[in-house]
Amino acid sequence: MADLLFEIGAEEIPAGFVPGALRQLEDDLAKALADARLAHGEVRSVGTPRRLAVWARDVAPKQTDARTEAFGPPVAQAYDAEGKPTPAATGFARSQGVEVSALVRAQTPKGERVAVTKVEKGRRAEQVLPALLERLVGGLRFRKAMRSRFDEATFARPVRWMVALLGGRPLKVRHGEVTSGKVTYGHRFLAPKAIALKGTPDDYLAKLRRAHVLADPVERRAALLAELARAGKEAAGKVREDPALVEQVLYLVEEPTAVVGEFEKSNLELPPEVVISEMRNHQRYFAVVDGKGRLKNRFVAVSATRVKDPAVARHGYERVLRARLADARFFFEEDRKRKLHERIEDLGRRTFQAKLGSELDRAQRIGAVASALARALGKDALVADLLEASRLAKVDLNTGMVGEFPELQGTMGAHYARLEGLKPEIADAIEDHYKPIGAAEELPRSDLGALVAVADRLHSLVGIIGVGEKATGAADPFGLRRAAIGILRIVIARGYHLSLAAAVEQTLDALSGVKLAAGRALVAEQVLDFLRGRVRAAWTERFDADLVEAVLAAGSDDVVDARRRLEALADAKARPDFGSLAVAFKRVANIQEKAGGSGAAAVDPALLRDAAEKDLLAALEKVEQEVVARRAARDYPAVLRTVATLEPAVARFFDGVLVMAEDPALRANRLGLMRRVAALFSDLADFRKIQAEAPAQARAG
């Protein structure tokens, strides 16, 4: 057994490319070794901006032998009556490269046939691996790649060297004009000389560490966090937590060195988000806060190298930030010269979408939709504030600050609203209507912000789909999936019992002046299908797919209600008696469907002949009122517990009663009994879609 080590050294790879490339390397090498029949131990990747490396421990010295069996014609066609090979047999043997005497008889699902077993002897690992590694590096995919000057080889950035070692012995691997060897290189400035490697992962990591390269991202992250903690103390505070920035900086440096810098205190008069955004998004600096979380006029930059005089690096970082903050202060002061209300009409000169009009049109429609949603929820008292918040929600798009810092849209509008003395709830709604930005981000804080946020997303979703634009495959240029997920997260989190169909119709009302690409009814159905698809995708990440399908089939117009039904059903499925319950109710639903699905649920007690059907009616009458009351209260766990008490009576009914009796009166009566049972659970879930079996003892009984 020997360790395989493979490193690709390159010019600086963009930070966002490195994590994905390392995952690809690890997954692809493990699969390639398995496909090549080379046994191995741990496969792991490490990397920095200048190198991507992967290793496999304990690689077998040779491939395992491969046995393959090829089947030919039926025996009856392969041999004549005297047992001599026919042309069919000799032709098959020739096609397989063997003598006809090597053919054997084999039983197959298609009868007895002639066959040949071939053994491919395994080759030595060093014969197999060079081509395997060339495919590995050539198969790496990046969002953008550069082509070699001399051939068709591509990579994220020009490849400068490669290392390919098996048990310390070099393998010859080519990519473009680069051929692998056994030397790597340390830090570009601190240790640029060639480093000879022995070929083990531990030797590789140790030698690079001495050459100022922490190749393992886990080790480098620990070093980065330690540097940030040290620098925070030096700055008389602590570094503001920012996991996303840590992850980004992690792949910008090979050995992190933190540098503390300072900016003018007067810049703390700017909104904190402006200063933080300038530092993190434009310069990759970490903000420093005091013990109460307030921003200090200090920052921490992470350098990719060490300089003899740290003051030189510090002054460079400070100079760049000073200029950027001066620009921010200028935009802030200029923006404050005009009130938000004075900027509303400016939105009319800013296009939202060519077929949907201006941002002013958008703001007015958002207000109309938000007001309709509020009335549907019985929150009429919010309408005036909703209209005001909707008018102002997009106004900051025309400010200099948002032009310079697009990521602060909403945030700046809220700051300006507070500075102008507008109602705090309005200011919060301006900021919150962009939330949630991502699938796990925070939600709006109030009904005001939540309703404007939902209305904004509904307008985009219905409007964009309405004019014929859609999300297809991985492409979603208008963020429709994100909008749909945002709607669902807000509605469920705030417990809004909204009809999605009605909300879509209200949005179409607001879009009445827009020319739709299809009929209104078709657009509405397309939007609802899109929303249902997002519901299904989101819920199947947490719940069993069959339960999700069962609940959605029973109705998903009110997603809050559907989510509660799903949670109750998931809890019920975890109980040992659920299989019997699901099977019994599935039979009820199937019989109802076969009988036509509709019809009277009336039951005439005088027509009940068997004890089992009488017992079932008695059990029904005992629980029906309780189920109705529990269902009205949306207490679905209680509904399921109560309905579950019917399972023994339903099981006895099916064991002893023929529902589809020849007597029409008996048949109709028994179908009516089934419909009454189905009425208790049919609006909870379609049990026919649930994958469940009765326990073995129940089936045996």
From Swiss-Prot:
One of its GO terms (biological process) is glycyl-tRNA aminoacylation. The keyword Nucleotide-binding applies. InterPro entries: DALR_anticod-bd, Gly-tRNA-synth_bsu, Gly-tRNA-synth_heterodimer. It catalyses: tRNA(Gly) + glycine + ATP = glycyl-tRNA(Gly) + AMP + diphosphate. The keyword Heme does not apply. It comes from the Bacteria. Keywords: Aminoacyl-tRNA synthetase, ATP-binding, Cytoplasm, Ligase, Nucleotide-binding, Protein biosynthesis. Its EC number is 6.1.1.14. GO terms for cellular component: cytosol. PROSITE patterns: AA_TRNA_LIGASE_II_GLYAB. It is found in: Cytoplasm. Pfam families: DALR_1 (PF05746), tRNA_synt_2f (PF02092). One of its GO terms (molecular function) is arginine-tRNA ligase activity. Tetramer of two alpha and two beta subunits. Belongs to the class-II aminoacyl-tRNA synthetase family. This is Glycine--tRNA ligase beta subunit. It comes from Anaeromyxobacter sp. (strain K).
